[in-house]
Amino acid sequence: KQTGGHGQFGHVFVEFAPNPDEIEMVFEEKVFGGAIPKGYFPAVETGLRECMEKGILAGYKVVNVKATLLDGKYHDVDSSEMAFKLAAHLAYKDAMPKANPVLLEPIVDVQVKVPDEYTGDILGDFNKRRGAIMGMDMKDGYQMINAQIPLAEMQKYAIELRAMTKGRGTYTQRFERYDPLPQALSERIIAQAKEDNEA
């Protein structure tokens, strides 16, 4: 995209691609022949990183994206770092809606240790929390249950586990990955974000 006017000329061609291996945006440049002086590359990267902080769907940070600066144009007099930063903003705003972005939610790996008599209650509870049972192991009258559950579903879990097991259950959790939100939930969050922005 280009920003025009006296003292503000910058033109960039940026390719955006999924990058599931990295949460933070990965920036590369593949500009050949001096179409853009190297001194402007950091401004393009900064502009893109600023945009990634607030996604287009509901304002959440954009993750798992690789941005590659492929080409562009500059002007000896009218180009500046600010012009290339603004051009990066425009490229992002133009490309992101076309990329079919989705909302993601953090998934945690949960390990629960409970007396065997509570296993059915725990499994039923995990099902209500949109959890996936990954494994179970019985040891000394205790069931070790491993599940992966959306973090949003784990609020107040310590209190609820204590109530379900009469204080005899324990658990640990750690971040595992991000997964796409179910469509109905995603639509609700996007609608709420639009409503909040209009207020």
Predicted regions and their residues:
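Accessory interaction regions appended to the cores of large information-processing enzymes
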Residues: 1-199
